[in-house]
């Protein structure tokens, strides 16, 4: 999650990079600041770590973000209990939040 990390990834021709732990290292503001010099190369990011329903729209609205991930989509207790319907509902809610920003 540093410019040096991005440079190393580019050496390997990687253009999609994990941005972790997103919120702990400065969130979307930090991501957008480090992304600027690489935009012309088509580098995109997948923020993880601290992404939540409350900041999902901000992240997904950024042109630097390809996708997001978060443990809130499949909390451990729901996985352990096999509550796939609840996990599906959380995923559907996330999709609806994001769709609302693109329509």
How should each PLM-predicted stretch be described?
Residues 25, 32-37:
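A charged, well-structured terminal subsegment
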Residues 77-103:
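C-terminal helical cap(s) of enzyme catalytic domains, especially alpha/beta-barrels
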Residues 6, 28-31, 56, 88-95:
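Generic structural signal for well-ordered alpha-helices
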Residues 38-47:
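Short beta-strand/loop segments at the ligand-binding rim of alpha/beta enzyme cores
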Residues 6, 18-27, 63-86:
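Glycine-rich phosphate-binding active-site loops on the catalytic face of alpha/beta enzymes
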């Amino acid at each position: 999650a540093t410019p040096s990390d991005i440079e190393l990834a580019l050496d390997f021709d990687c253009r999609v990079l994990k941005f972790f732990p997103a919120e702990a290292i400065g969130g979307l503001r930090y991501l957008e600041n480090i992304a600027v010099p690489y935009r012309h190369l088509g580098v995109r990011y997948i923020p993880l770590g601290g992404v939540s329903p409350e900041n999902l729209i901000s992240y997904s609205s950024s042109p630097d973000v390809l996708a997001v991930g978060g443990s809130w989509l499949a909390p451990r207790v729901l996985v352990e209990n096999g509550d796939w319907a609840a996990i599906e509902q959380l995923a559907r809610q996330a999709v609806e939040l994001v769709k609302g920003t693109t329509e």
